[in-house]
Amino acid sequence: MADLESCLEIHRHAGVGYLPLVFSAGWQAAILNWEPPVDLANLGEIERHSQTDEVFVLWRGRAALYVQAGSETRLVDLEPGVVYNVTAGTWHNLVASRDVSILIVENRDTHLNDTELRSIEDWERSQVLAQLPAWARQPEEENR
């Protein structure tokens, strides 16, 4: 009979930023905690992955996911416990509060081998800012 340690892995990430924690043959699960790139003050880049969908599940704090479809950028205020799947090839990024923690599931090593980054254009920034939820417009002290 197997012992508990070989049957159940427990992983935590309490630090800043993105950290893959569980790896399988073709996928990985990571936790993204607040980091400077997801702060509204640093709104500047957008990314896409050509070989994988990317799943986001908010479990603490507040976050808004923005995705681009053609000339339209849409922002979705994430709800805790809801699964959001960004399909492969879709430009996307996040704006988040400082207490945010998000579960991310994607192809293994996507962050190393399948991430294309670019600066957002002024028209994209305008569309994101126009759709911000109230929590993201509040002064930083209220957003913690």
Predicted regions and their residues:
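A short, N-terminal "cap"/entry segment at the start of jelly-roll beta-barrel domains
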Residues: M1-I31, V38-D39, E141-R144
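Short, surface-exposed beta-edge/turn micro-motifs
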Residues: G26-A29, T52-V55, G81, D99-S101
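Conserved short histidine dyad/triad with adjacent acidic residue
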Residues: L32-S50
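Short beta-strand segments in beta-sandwich/barrel cores
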Residues: D39, G61-V67, V83-Y84
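Short, conserved beta-strand element in jelly-roll/cupin
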Residues: H49-L65
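Short beta-strand His + acidic residue motifs that chelate non-heme Fe in jelly-roll/DSBH
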Residues: L65-Y66, V86, W91-S97, I104
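Short acidic-glycine-tyrosine-enriched beta hairpin
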Residues: G70-A88
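Double-stranded beta-helix
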Residues: V95-R144
